[in-house]
Amino acid sequence: MEAQPEAKRLFHLPVDSEHKATEFRPFSLSPPHMRAFHLAWLSLFACFFSTFSIPPLLAVIRRDLRLTDADVGNAGIASFAGAIFSRLAMGPVCDLLGPRTAIAALSLLTAPVVLSISLISSPQSFITIRFLIGFSLANFVANQFWMSSMFSGSVVGLANGVAAGWANVGSGFTQLIMPLIYTLITKFDISSSAAWRLAFLLPATFQAVTALMVLFYGQDLPDGNFERPQKPANKPKQNLLDDLFHGLKNYRGWILGLTYGYSFGVELTTDNIIAQYFYNRFDVNLQTAGAIAASFGLANCFSRPAGGLLSDEMGRRFGMRGRLWSLWVVQTVAGLLCVLLGRVDSLCGSVLVMCCFSFFVQAASGVTFGVVPFVSKRSLGVISGMTGSGGTIGAVATQLLLFSGSSKLSTETSISLMGVLMIVCTLSVALIYFPKWGGMFCGPSVGRYSSGEEEQDHSALLD
């Protein structure tokens, strides 16, 4: 209680005992909490913009490079496969170096890869480039780690949801912008082959600029950076290897990885196939297909934050049980809408169902990361990495099984089957149980709960 006046003097937002903000003001730029928020979402926005800058121009690129259906499918798989290992590694890297350095380093390393899209000349180089660009999506883990380090448990779901949601808008924004840039370049009497190559100057430059902003203007923790932490002298020193194994042994992280694989993983898969789906099935032009696909990604602006807000509100009212039930309900509804999307055979109906589906599948991702910060503060980076990797593993598995180009199933049938997989995998949420807070069907075992190592370092869940 005595530290609160000092906290008010040091910070622009009210904070808890760990100096994490207890309020979330998305239109504020005050350091360090809200400045970190804006740098986190903007840098990840640039990564999504770069990674998904290829699909809206795929019709042109495909013709120029003479890509087959198998090439396109394999490239889609490669774009997610590159993020699997990098997301797993990003959690421990954040624990070791801090989110600011991790984000800046990965973005600066992958920005030249984005620029090298202009040099590809064969299906093999196309697949390789998509694989390497996918590494940048690991910055999602650092994004969520950063927000969980800056915001208290009462608002962490909302902070995570808005930071990731606004960032994911990049996957929709690029669907609008890249065709416009390509069209604009061709108006200067530049050939189609050269125009699409020049268009990739924008995402590469944007990604590099945001990385430098994070590096020079960001701050890892409320009290300083990882290399100069102003931590209490009595805080025990953490061992990275111990924290890694501590996180990997936590079964809740594996379940959240599975469910996230069929919320965010499905979202990634849809980003990859939706423009081409409308282009082929309903005979719309490239710009129209891009605009429809953009609406799917742009919904992240409010849908994922809504999921985080729902998780926090249900946590306040019903504790952890409310968060878990929210996750199951929202993701199951998303699965049902995905099944319906594959069954609708009219353009207007498909667009309407797709918009509803986009809201629920993205909200499910937000609800998931409303639970993640409570699994283990000690191994927060590892748990975030496991969950985030689950998203890309789910995308790879779904793309490989249903949209690889070698499948005999139609795209619409594959979309419906993707919804069935969502519903089935979401059932595993019922297995998550916290001794201190309970689960979906069971209350907390306070009577036999003592002082387990894992729960000691959680932020308290609001009643």
Go through each PLM region and give its residues.
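Conserved MFS/SLC helix-loop-helix module at the cytosolic interface between two early adjacent transmembrane helices
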Residues: F85-Q124
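Helix-loop-helix hairpin linking two adjacent transmembrane segments in secondary transporters
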Residues: A163-P222
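Cytoplasmic helix-loop-helix junction between adjacent transmembrane helices
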Residues: I129-W166
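Structural signature of the two symmetry-related core transmembrane helices
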Residues: T101-L115, R321-V339
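Residue-level signature of mid-helix packing/kink "hotspots" within the transmembrane helices
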Residues: F52, S79-L88, A138, G172, ...
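Extracytoplasmic gate region of multi-pass secondary transporters
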Residues: I54-L58, G247-P305, S365
